[in-house]
Amino acid sequence: FTPEAFLQLISAFSSMFNARSIVDGLSLMNEESVGKQIAVKNLNISDEGLHPDNVGAFTFDGEGTPTQNINLIISGVLKNLLHSEATARKFGVQPTGHAGLGAKVSVSPDWLVVSNSENEKDKDESLSTTSTLKEYILIDELSAIHSGVKASQGSFSLPFDGWIVNDGKKTSIEAATVAGDILKVLTSIVKIDKEQIVTHQGISPHVWVENMSITGEA
């Protein structure tokens, strides 16, 4: 996955981190999920609304709670959830500054940042896993996010633009679809590049995932 495509996928399943979705029964997670391993050990994901590269940053959320940076996944472990005032009271924690006001108070991330955990043995192991690859598929951009994602079930089937890379030669892919389960994706990551790229929706490196289901033609 390119940084843009991986952020698209994580954002589509941000209900995993959303306490409002958990309360409403629309999340893959529950109250007991915090503290559990849900991804490979070298994956970090945080929400950093105050990051200097986030040009659309707000100091406060819709309820007036100060915006704050919060770790969501550290070394593959779910560490925190995103809260409004109401969900924070229900869970017995402090609001995190992620509420939006509308007909109903919503909760959503501001600026996702994906990185490789440091000092993990499997980081070096994963580098060797992909360094010898002669052919792979690069997913550049996902489409039909709203119709192709079943967030509460964890499944997705999404058209994508991308490339077949063979010995460094890139061939454009036409009319292809990638399908799978988000929790399986998070546990099937074999490499997270060191270099992070700033995009319009957050920051991420390239992320390599094995055993993806892809159909289509070049």
Model regions and ranges:
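Dual-mode signal for accessory low-complexity, basic/Gly-rich regions
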Residues: 17-19, 32-218
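Active-site pocket-lining segments that scaffold enzyme catalytic pockets across diverse folds
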Residues: 1-32
